[in-house]
Amino acid sequence: MFEARLIQGSILKKVLEALKDLINEACWDVSSGGVNLQSMDSSHVSLVQLTLRSEGFDTYRCDRNLAMGVNLTSMSKILKCAGNEDIITLRAEDNADTLALVFEAPNQEKVSDYEMKLMDLDVEQLGIPEQEYSCVIKMPSGEFARICRDLSHIGDAVVISCAKNGVKFSASGELGNGNIKLSQTSNVDKEEEAVTIEMNEPVHLTFALRYLNFFTKATPLSPTVTLSMSADVPLVVEYKIADMGHLKYYLAPKIEDEEAS
């Protein structure tokens, strides 16, 4: 059987909020090493990859590997019934067609349990190649969310230009254009407020803001976000989940011809 208990249950609530608008259903691959999910979004434009390592859970048991087909909208509805302070336990038998979710209030005076029907999903796993990137930007996740939100009022796409001294986000549309430039921070007290840029070569790429705004739903999971870019390969937007793993989004750049058309 599979059983995983998470004292900080709010992490699972935040993960579902970050996934549910982008993907409707996905396979949760559960093994002794932890929980993994990989899925294209419903329009097959972006890819999501989630890792929650077993040691990040407070107790974790998995006797044999399971692939659980989950409707993320349904799971999100059930998790909304959990309080932010609740302890969450996930449980499934080896051949189960349901996943049990148990929510315990911290004072243990209230226990709620739900059973969610699982789905049969035929999922192909895509190999994600390890890649060296020309430009890696680490910045506060709230700042990235705000930039994407602000620029989506101007245009549908953002051009991210990365050079040694800073990174520029630009958008243009019918009302005009907007540019937001962030310089690398030299001295900040808190690491999560820093902007750091590792650049091997300059990068100038265009991405659909609609998808970046979906990705920023993961902002509550992490104070920082990492953007990794190279020409002609998908952008990686990574949110670390403290002591547990990460949530990564992949988005291919828009081709220049598409913009002209």
From Swiss-Prot:
GO molecular-function term, one example from the UniProt record: DNA polymerase processivity factor activity
Keyword Manganese: no
Post-translational modification as stated in the protein's UniProt record: Phosphorylated. Phosphorylation at Tyr-211 by EGFR stabilizes chromatin-associated PCNA.
A GO BP entry: response to cadmium ion
UniProt crosslink position (Glycyl lysine isopeptide (Lys-Gly) (interchain with G-Cter in SUMO2)): 164, 254
Pfam families: PCNA_C, PCNA_N
Record's keyword terms, sorted: Acetylation, Disulfide bond, DNA damage, DNA repair, DNA replication, DNA-binding, Isopeptide bond, Methylation, Nucleus, Phosphoprotein, Ubl conjugation
Induction details: Induced in IL2-stimulated proliferating T-lymphocytes.
Protein localization: Nucleus
DNA-binding region location: 61-80
Disulfide cross-links: 135-162
Coiled coil spans: none
Crosslinked positions (Glycyl lysine isopeptide (Lys-Gly) (interchain with G-Cter in ubiquitin)): 164
Domain of life: Eukaryota
Modified residues (Phosphotyrosine): 211
GO CC, one annotated term: nuclear lamina
InterPro entries: DNA_clamp_sf (IPR046938), Pr_cel_nuc_antig (IPR000730), Pr_cel_nuc_antig_C (IPR022649), Pr_cel_nuc_antig_CS (IPR022659), Pr_cel_nuc_antig_N (IPR022648)
Modified residues (N6-acetyllysine): 14, 77, 80, 248
Alphabetical list of HAMAP family matching this protein: DNApol_clamp_arch
Described purpose of this protein according to its UniProt entry: Auxiliary protein of DNA polymerase delta and epsilon, is involved in the control of eukaryotic DNA replication by increasing the polymerase's processibility during elongation of the leading strand. Induces a robust stimulatory effect on the 3'-5' exonuclease and 3'-phosphodiesterase, but not apurinic-apyrimidinic (AP) endonuclease, APEX2 activities. Has to be loaded onto DNA in order to be able to stimulate APEX2.
Assembly, per entry: Homotrimer. Interacts with p300/EP300; the interaction occurs on chromatin in UV-irradiated damaged cells. Interacts with CREBBP (via transactivation domain and C-terminus); the interaction occurs on chromatin in UV-irradiated damaged cells. Directly interacts with POLD1, POLD3 and POLD4 subunits of the DNA polymerase delta complex, POLD3 being the major interacting partner; the interaction with POLD3 is inhibited by CDKN1A/p21(CIP1). Forms a complex with activator 1 heteropentamer in the presence of ATP. Interacts with EXO1, POLH, POLK, DNMT1, ERCC5, FEN1, CDC6 and POLDIP2.
Family of this protein: Belongs to the PCNA family.
The protein, known as: Proliferating cell nuclear antigen
Species, as recorded: Mus musculus (Mouse)
Protein's gene: Pcna
